[in-house]
Amino acid sequence: MIKQITFITLFIFDHFHKKKIINYVKNKLDIYSINILLDIGAHKGESIDFFSKNLNIKKMISFEASPDNCDFLKTKYRNKKNLIIENKALSSKEGELIFNQCNESSSSTFSEINENSKYLRKKMNFLNMSKGDNFFKKQVIKTTTLDKYLYDNHIFNVDLIKIDTEGHEFEILKGLKINIKNINTIIFEHHYDDMIKKNYTFSDINNFLKKNSFTKVFKAKMPFRKSFEYIYVKNKQ
């Protein structure tokens, strides 16, 4: 019963957190209609539902590295005409990476997991799991870059990119060497906990985006997590 109440509480707080984001997008950035939205790290479709409910979207492309999650998405959204689901892993270059597929799939990541993390222990306790439950398994996944995907699919302008890839956000942005000039707005999540071993800091992302003419306009802490969500917009010429 306690676990059920906790999950309900988290759901409610997440709802208000997301509402804060969409209110900013609409009221401050004046974004109501979108031609192309890239949803990177689609998971089980949370952001697909969120953006579809709140914005008028002509075309959404959702990327999900996990084959299992992608199969789920293709079944769930088989009748959604403005949605393309891609079982592709995006990174800074083409190749292969080891993907840590977690039983609690929202934590799946290309980053190395710190098994001694206090945050991980708290999370596993919250989910009523133990290390004996094989919390994650390793898979080799092929990667590509956003530059290559956009070029191959003749996409020359993107209104909004959302990135939530559990510690791989910077690598994805680095795969935008050419086409970053064609992106208008970027929403991404950044972890400050010790569960994920990242080889970059928030300052690295911030400096990269500033160098490419983006400005940070929004920051909000995610409920009950050591993570923040940020919004950056392209500077007007």
Pin down the residues of each PLM region.
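Phosphate/nucleotide-binding beta-alpha loop and adjacent structural elements of enzyme active sites
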Residues: 1-237
